[in-house]
């Protein structure tokens, strides 16, 4: 028997990431090749015409799994009964804009969206915040939706995770698929800490294979942390297809499970590994039956603790910067 369609809300639907994302969702890449979807697309009033153009293209692909499309500039229409919500749209940083102003501009957007999700989304909605600053935007949305479970709100660290994977694959000369137990701690920003101390490639320790602390500090972490800036420098535009791909990976694994494989998700802390409760923090997780679980019992050495503290301090500062807007 055919499955009932799942409702997938996407904000910033007319944007670059949205354009890279929607066709893959409609093709079944995110929720499975047997799962029909209804896309509920949100964007600003001035972007409605552009969204209509994207929808024409979606129609022209004749995707068997696409059961319907809604276009709107009203969050309450976009999030109505949503099973999955991808919050992609965010205020980008414009020239001369202070980080504080960026935080405040986004706080307003994500407060409105959090409240709308709280009112109209499915009680089991899975929310992924892609729009930057992703961790803090996810924190704001979560705090604005007191009637939804906190664990329904997540931030995207999967792009950092995938970037780290590809760097390790290149360094070891091994395929990406052979690398396991690599993960990322903290904020989706250059302070994130990609940790390969427990990673294996074909069952062998990556740390032993590479055995190069200088490469770790001077090449690996800066390359992963500043990859977004390097792409803007090279392409003149921010990373869109890779961000969309990471969003699909994140939701697919959350919904369909990782079969014991460790991945990275930005999730609200319950105090694990000494991170203050409610902090939206990148953690190593496994997922099954639509739920994620933090990998327990990892030893945090002095070097790792120092790196985790740096990214945590940045997140605490961001959190403090928006607290007055949360009432």
UniProtKB/Swiss-Prot annotation:
GO BP terms in the entry: malate metabolic process; tricarboxylic acid cycle
Enzyme Commission code: 1.1.1.37
Oxidoreductase found in the keyword field: yes
Keywords: NAD, Oxidoreductase, Tricarboxylic acid cycle
Keyword Nuclease (UniProt): no
Residues bound to NAD(+): 12-18, 106, 113, 130-132
Active site feature: 188 (proton acceptor)
Enzyme category, top tier: oxidoreductase
Residues at which substrate binds: 93, 99, 132, 163
A GO molecular-function annotation: L-malate dehydrogenase (NAD+) activity
Domain of life of the source: Bacteria
Catalytic activity: (S)-malate + NAD(+) = oxaloacetate + NADH + H(+)
InterPro entries: L-lactate/malate_DH, Lactate/malate_DH_C, Lactate/malate_DH_N, Lactate_DH/Glyco_Ohase_4_C, Malate_DH_type2, NAD(P)-bd_dom_sf
Pfam families assigned: Ldh_1_C, Ldh_1_N
NCBIfam families tied to this protein: MalateDH-SF1, PRK05442.1
Homology family: Belongs to the LDH/MDH superfamily. MDH type 2 family.
Function: Catalyzes the reversible oxidation of malate to oxaloacetate.
Protein name, per record: Malate dehydrogenase
UniProt organism field: Cupriavidus necator (strain ATCC 17699 / DSM 428 / KCTC 22496 / NCIMB 10442 / H16 / Stanier 337) (Ralstonia eutropha)
């Amino acid at each position: 028997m055919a499955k009932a369609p799942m409702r997938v809300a996407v904000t910033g639907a007319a944007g670059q990431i949205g354009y890279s994302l929607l066709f893959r969702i409609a093709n079944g890449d995110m929720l499975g090749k047997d799962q029909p979807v209804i896309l509920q697309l949100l964007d600003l009033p001035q972007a409605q015409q552009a969204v209509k153009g994207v929808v024409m293209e979606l129609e022209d692909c004749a995707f068997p799994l696409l059961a319907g499309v809604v276009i709107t500039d009203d969050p309450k229409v976009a999030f109505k009964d949503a099973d999955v919500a991808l919050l992609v749209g965010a205020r980008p940083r414009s020239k001369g804009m202070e980080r504080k102003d960026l935080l405040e501009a986004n706080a307003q957007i994500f407060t409105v969206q959090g409240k709308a999700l709280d009112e109209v989304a499915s009680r089991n909605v899975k929310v992924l915040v892609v729009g930057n600053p992703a961790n803090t935007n996810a924190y704001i949305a979560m705090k604005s939706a007191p009637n939804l479970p906190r664990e329904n709100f997540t931030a995207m660290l999967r792009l950092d995770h995938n970037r780290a994977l590809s760097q390790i694959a290149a360094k070891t000369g091994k395929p990406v698929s052979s690398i396991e137990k690599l993960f990322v701690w903290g904020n989706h920003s250059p302070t994130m800490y990609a940790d390969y101390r427990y990673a294996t490639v074909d069952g062998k320790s990556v740390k032993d294979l590479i055995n190069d602390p200088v490469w770790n500090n001077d090449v690996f972490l800066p390359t992963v942390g500043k990859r977004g800036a390097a792409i803007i420098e090279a392409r003149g535009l921010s990373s869109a297809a890779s961000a969309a791909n990471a969003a699909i990976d994140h939701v697919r694994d959350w919904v369909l499970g990782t079969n014991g494989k460790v991945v990275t998700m930005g999730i609200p802390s319950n105090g694990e590994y000494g991170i203050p409760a409610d902090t939206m923090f990148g953690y190593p997780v496994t997922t099954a039956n639509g739920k994620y679980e933090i990998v327990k019992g990892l030893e945090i050495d002095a070097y790792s603790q120092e790196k985790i503290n740096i990214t945590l301090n940045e997140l605490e500062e961001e959190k403090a910067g928006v607290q007055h807007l949360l009432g």
